Amino acid sequence: MVLALEDPPLAPSPLVLVVDASASMAAREGKGTRLDLAKERVLPLLERSPEAVLVRAGERPEAFGPAPGIALKERLLALEAKDRKGDLEAAIALGRRLLKAPVVVATDGPPPPGVEGYVGVGSPRENLGIVAVAAGFLALGNGAGRPLPAQVEVGGKTFRVEVPP
């Protein structure tokens, strides 16, 4: 009698999951937002991971874990995209300090260098929007690779401006 032994299936591995929480991730994409799409795509990875760190990449990164991936599910689902920008580099560094494991980044930007995994979300399109508002102050952000025109109305006056990338 001959027995054939299959290679054992690959076991899930520990994981550092960095999720972009910048304002651009709140952009509509299909029936939800880019962040919703990112959550949907990375949730299976997180749920299977025996140990994970989840890092919200906002202006100041915020980490959860290390913990079993399934224990971080609610934290992932509760993430919001509201920061003016996401500091992916700082978020990746924080995750690596907390857990020595492959890093997967979910973002609507290009793949960051030096990570083991990338989950890209969002259609490639020009993105112009308000990134900060205060009394007497308005900041516009341009995610395109070229200057874009904008029109802003303040106190009944209309201003046309060119917003650099």
Region locations from a protein language model:
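N-linked glycosylation sequons
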Residues: 1-165
